[in-house]
Curated annotation (Swiss-Prot):
Keyword annotations of the record: Ribonucleoprotein, Ribosomal protein, RNA-binding, rRNA-binding
Ribosomal protein keyword on record: yes
Oligomer status and interactors: Part of the 30S ribosomal subunit. Interacts with proteins S7 and S18. Binds to IF-3.
Name of this protein: Small ribosomal subunit protein uS11
Organism from which the protein derives: Coxiella burnetii (strain CbuK_Q154) (Coxiella burnetii (strain Q154))
Domain of life: Bacteria
InterPro entries for the chain: Ribosomal_uS11, Ribosomal_uS11_bac-type, Ribosomal_uS11_CS, Ribosomal_uS11_sf
Disulfide partners: none
Length: 123
């Protein structure tokens, strides 16, 4: 069976959503079409280990390798969303996969006193 042909995309955008329970990374082209996706849960981490920085780094290394090998991607802009623990380590994982980070943007949604927040945890 022949290997699937991918189109060449040299620059892309990495969308990182870091929640407290998981970290999702998707790589798209400049128009926003998703090329590849990986999460910490999809990288083999289960339960509370999905929300760790190590899980985010492994997922971003995998998605970075996919983007580099399949789409010949070299440069990437990063958009981070969410308060999770895997924010910085996901960016580090993309760099270690051989991608050059050209732009870094924080898109965490902040309410202008909108909905009432969740109750405080009592441990």
């Amino acid at each position: 069976m022949a290997k699937k042909r991918y189109r060449k995309v040299t620059e892309g955008i990495a969308h990182i959503k870091a929640t407290f329970n998981n970290t999702m990374i998707s790589v798209s082209d400049s128009q926003g079409n998703v090329l590849c996706f990986r999460s910490a849960g999809g990288s083999g981490f289960k339960g509370s280990r999905k929300g760790t920085p190590y899980g985010a780094q492994m997922a971003s290394e995998e998605v970075g390798r996919l983007a580099r090998d399949n789409f010949d991607m070299r440069r990437i802009a990063v958009r981070v969303k969410g308060p999770g623990a895997g924010r910085d380590s996901a960016i580090r994982g993309l760099r270690s996969a051989g991608l050059e980070v050209i732009h870094l943007e924080d898109r965490t949604p902040l309410p202008h006193n909108g909905c009432r927040p969740r109750k405080k945890r009592r441990v």
